[in-house]
Curated annotation (Swiss-Prot):
Participates actively in the response to hyperosmotic and heat shock by preventing the aggregation of stress-denatured proteins and by disaggregating proteins, also in an autonomous, DnaK-independent fashion. Unfolded proteins bind initially to DnaJ; upon interaction with the DnaJ-bound protein, DnaK hydrolyzes its bound ATP, resulting in the formation of a stable complex. GrpE releases ADP from DnaK; ATP binding to DnaK triggers the release of the substrate protein, thus completing the reaction cycle. It comes from Methanosarcina mazei. Pfam families: DnaJ, DnaJ_C, DnaJ_CXXCXGXG. Zn(2+) 2 binds at C161, C164, C187, C190. The gene is dnaJ. The J domain is necessary and sufficient to stimulate DnaK ATPase activity. Zinc center 1 plays an important role in the autonomous, DnaK-independent chaperone activity of DnaJ. Zinc center 2 is essential for interaction with DnaK and for DnaJ activity. This is Chaperone protein DnaJ.
Amino acid sequence: MATKRDYYEILGLSKDSSVEDIKKTYRKLALQYHPDRNKEPGAEEKFKEISEAYAVLSDAEKRAQYDRFGHAGIDNQYSAEDIFRGADFGGFGDIFEMFFGGGRRGGPMGPRRGSDLQYDLYVTFEEAAFGVRKDIDIPRTERCSTCSGTGAKPGTSPKRCPNCGGTGQVRTTRSTLGMQFVSTTTCSACHGRGQVVESPCPTCSGAGRVRSRRKMSVNVPAGADSGMTLRLSGEGDAGEPGAPSGDLYIIVHVMEHKYFKRVDYDVISELPISFTQAALGADIMVDTLYGKVKMNIPSGTQTHSVFRLKDKGIQRLQGHGKGDQLVRVIIRTPTKLTQEQKDLLHQFEYLSNGKKPEAEERSRSDKQKSEKPRKSKGLFEKVKDAFES
């Protein structure tokens, strides 16, 4: 299947173009490619392409859906006929007849499908990772139980529209630049239904539908991420009699976690450690989605080193296995030191670089003369004791 071109590209417009710009451009292109005027090969297909782009972009609701979801947002929500329904083509022929054949001529549009709805669902990091069932309350329109959706008062029924004779369409003919164009527009009296209600239902005032609320449970699968869309078929607004209800689209939003971040199916976390733990090594308990686990920090670990905890990440959608947890080590530098800690660090610096401050050397020499020799711990043990006590 060929990939559809971008509607804005077809009309040569940008996404911030006004409705007037869209209408003006369409009229110009439609006049150029209308098959009654342009007999070149491909002109009719070009005209259809232009008309489809205009039908979507000239309608605020369809345009918003397209801007957000692209062609998928239009194809999933509207039938081919719904795309063109209600658009003002400015007299450039019978668009319905051109797209759908002569069978559309003279017939009512038929019952309209219900509108799709969207609901933003917020879940915690853990709920998205493990899956959760959430109860939601959706405002929507439902079929009126009093009139069964007809809009007519009980005991009565809708009548044929006198304005269009029940066709749902009004045809007009006009001449432009010496050419005669036939236009079919939706009947304004019956809005394309072919019927009118003379005695409206007292419950829905003739609309056939009423506002209501629907409580339901939504299953968010393990591994869901922000932006994921769940489609619940038939849970949108009610359609007209004989037409299906729209769908409900649940947009998942995952709230931020205090410690964890997510990249694909991996969990990212940071682990602050002391510089003695980094230098000497240590076994440290690390928080994961599945509880605390022991992780070994080898001696000589540098700050920003990353350690991988296998299978401690997010469950993969529609697949087996999990991601990993990536733990980035952050070495903390102490800001308040005791004299003992400073002395030990000076000694460490001397052993590392062979240079010791003269004042410290004299002080330590005098101290050693006044003390009796005794067995002492190694330098690293002293440093560890001093900084972890």
